[in-house]
Amino acid sequence: SPTEQPYSSAAPLI
């Protein structure tokens, strides 16, 4: 997971 959210969420890849 990018941050703590699911991969398909609005979380950035970095």
Swiss-Prot record:
<keyword id="KW-0793">Thylakoid</keyword>
<keyword id="KW-0934">Plastid</keyword>
<keyword id="KW-0150">Chloroplast</keyword>
<protein>
    <recommendedName>
        <fullName>Unknown protein from spot 115 of 2D-PAGE of thylakoid</fullName>
    </recommendedName>
</protein>
<dbReference type="GO" id="GO:0009534">
    <property type="term" value="C:chloroplast thylakoid"/>
</dbReference>
